[in-house]
Amino acid sequence: MDTKRLIRRVAAMLTMGLGIATGGQAIEVPEPNAVMVNESSFRCIREMVPVRHFYIDNLLGNMPGALEAANAPNGAVYPPGTVVQLVPTEAMVKREQGFNPATGDWEFFELEVSESGSKIRTRGFADVNNRFGKNCFACHVPAREPWDFICESGHGCEAIPIDHSMTGALQRSDPRCGTPEPQSGDTVALFKLRALILIGMMVDWVKGIF
């Protein structure tokens, strides 16, 4: 057997071996600048950096850039890897440039949180809804420019049915953080929030009937 034929046979054997080892699936190699997001990307919200009434993080370590954008008085584009959360169960993550221009490269997440960590319930771009049935992308579109889709007072976004007392209570009771840090009024705020969620579920149920 000549050398070239031997090399071809060895290469074929190696290829078959890789196919068996990977279940026949091609090995996905991430892009060099890709922002990898999985359930471990999300942590106790109070371990993130507070900015006014929300929290931010950066999966690529670029916190200076994220903070600069968050505090820019006239708005700015957030750097890739930025995580923005108002409540523990919802998040926005800035993906790599060009990943989804329609959403400004933001990916939206609905999370399930517990003492054991975070579980991604839903993720995507223009098709993710929050627990009130509101579409995340549609809510944030009015703040496209110059705020890079970040909703705050005066950014043009439609008002949400919860106030800062409710979001603060949720932040302080994030089960991923261990012992809650309740403040006066948190119990009432959480009760009102649960009532709003139940009302929303009832409305959806009635709509489903008719």
Locations of regions flagged by a protein language model:
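Bacterial N-terminal signal peptides
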Residues: 11-21
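Sequence context surrounding c-type heme c attachment/ligation sites in exported
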Residues: 27-53, 75-210
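Bacterial N-terminal signal peptides that target proteins for export
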Residues: 2-11
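Helix-centric, low-specificity signal for extended rod-like, repetitive segments
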Residues: 1-2, 187
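N-terminal post-signal-peptidase region of extra-cytosolic proteins
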Residues: 60-74
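Compact soluble domain cores
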Residues: 50-64
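A general structural-boundary detector
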Residues: 13, 68, 123-126
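Sec/Tat signal peptide C-region and signal peptidase I cleavage site
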Residues: 22-26
